[in-house]
């Protein structure tokens, strides 16, 4: 159906099983999961699909090596299982990618090797190659432009890489094949309630400037860093459930890497992780982790972030990138779940949480691309428990 036909479909006063607010990774995933079970689904995205965080990732499908230091083994295990599933299920937009951790201090080689062996162990019977220690010559072979002053060797491991925006569009198209109806440039302005229970939404189509009343049995809020604004349409709460964090990436020319392998800086002076990742004819450098107060759909990189990335990655290149070598910059916002016990965003977990309000609104926050499928499945499972009719069939994904 074209856009006009879709809105005519809404005007028939159909009551959908699910209304999903938000057309990023989680929203599209929920639309696909629910529609594949046989439920009727309408999804509304205020901007374009994957306009926000979901198209501004580091392009990695990974378990999260850095979470091992925080003993978040369950999170790593789930992410590694989902990594393998996603690689098999979407092989046309994913690929394996090798990384090297260059080592300049003797004991660190074994420290990183031990951590990555634990990563291998948690991944179980994965089809990814196992990590291994490599000597200085091999590091230079894999990373021709690496700074070899004081280089002692390194550790090599593999993870997944993907095209985030293309995967998002593919998920949306697949959901439509299962019968879901997806709308972009359509914002939810208010809820329709009966006896304080949500029964639908009022949607503004920014293309035609029309308002549509759309009814449903379940409404799921999947708006990422903007989740609080949708919750506030339901009820005012003084407590924010989201603590947004900004991540900036620099894109430089491929000549600075000269390899199909990337490298990982496991610990910067302030305890963060940085990547240099081959991406088509370019190299992605990133990312930062800075708290922000008010989320924006088009966040702007800060000069301090640009300087931070360049300062830390320069130490690892022989031919060093300068500001004039930056081809483009992109910035995304992480929808981290707020935790009063953690003062810094870099210490917050990438775990997701699912909230249900008294009115029946389900909000899912947190998570990342790697685990989008599992998060979507759990969210729809919870919604099904609230839904009076049983699922026509089980999740097929």
Where are these regions (language model features)?
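C-terminal catalytic lobe of FAD-dependent flavoproteins
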Residues: 241-242, 256, 264-284, 291-389
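Core beta-strand elements of the Rossmann-like FAD/NAD(P) dinucleotide-binding domain
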Residues: 210-218
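Flavin (FAD/FMN) cofactor-binding and adjacent substrate-gating region
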Residues: 103-178, 183, 194-197, 280, ...
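Single conserved hydrophobic/aromatic residue that forms the stacking wall/gate
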Residues: 387-397
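Flavin (primarily FAD) binding-site architecture
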Residues: 221-235
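Extreme N-terminal leader/targeting segments of oxidoreductases
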Residues: 1-18, 36-37
